[in-house]
């Protein structure tokens, strides 16, 4: 898979093209083995100049993460936009995003996050969509290419509520410090190992399951 992706990225680079990269599972989740996450991270660093947007899903949560460069963890290569879904989960309101991109560079400049208020929709028997927030205003940046976003983001009640797609069913947990800390860790983690370390998870079942999964897959040779 990575050989194919590298060929596609290399071909786009030679042609002077800009690309949008879409995958399903964000880097920090347990479904990515460590070597898989690192190899993708290296490709994101190498081809960051042609990647105008990197988009994921899977979690059904409203998130973003900044992907650090593999060779310099003080610099960032791309922003990973993790979009909530239209699925009517019991603890997430259905959502969709409208991205605004620069016509020349194709880089994402901003996006508008829409929600479906299920309570009002069920009362009135018609969909009631509303704008939850505009990203540049929410993150207090001029555009979404401002990597200072990580220092400007205030992980608090408002941020956690946004992460869980505004649903009132989760209201009690939005001020829970454990939940706030978990969301902070997801915001700052580029692989599942980092997430577990950030969460200070005891080396129990979750840790060893991920360890076993990593052992089952072929390691990525360090000289590649």
Task: Name each model feature, range by range.
Residues 1-11, 61-224:
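Metal-dependent phosphoesterase/phosphodiesterase active-site architecture
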Residues 1-78, 95:
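His/acidic metal-ligating clusters that form di-metal
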């Amino acid at each position: 898979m990575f050989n194919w992706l590298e060929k596609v990225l290399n071909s786009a680079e030679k042609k002077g093209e800009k690309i949008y990269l879409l995958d399903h599972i964000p880097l920090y989740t347990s479904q990515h083995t460590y070597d898989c996450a690192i190899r993708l991270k290296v490709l994101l660093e190498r081809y960051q100049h042609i990647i105008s947007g990197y988009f994921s899903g899977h979690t059904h949560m409203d998130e973003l993460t900044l992907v650090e460069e593999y060779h310099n963890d003080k610099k960032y290569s791309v922003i990973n936009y993790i979009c909530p879904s239209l699925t009517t989960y019991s603890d997430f309101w259905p959502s969709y995003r409208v991205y605004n991109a620069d016509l020349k560079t194709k880089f994402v400049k901003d996006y508008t996050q829409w929600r479906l208020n299920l309570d009002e929709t069920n009362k009135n028997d018609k969909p009631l969509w509303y704008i939850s927030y505009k990203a540049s205003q929410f993150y207090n940046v001029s555009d979404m290419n401002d990597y200072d976003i990580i220092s400007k983001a205030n992980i608090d009640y408002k941020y956690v509520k946004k992460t869980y797609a505004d649903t009132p069913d989760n209201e009690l947990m939005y001020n829970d410090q454990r939940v706030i800390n978990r969301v902070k860790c997801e915001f700052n983690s580029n692989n599942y190992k980092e997430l577990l370390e950030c969460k200070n998870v005891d080396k129990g079942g979750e840790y060893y399951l991920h360890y076993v999964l990593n052992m089952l897959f072929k390691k990525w040779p360090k000289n590649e």
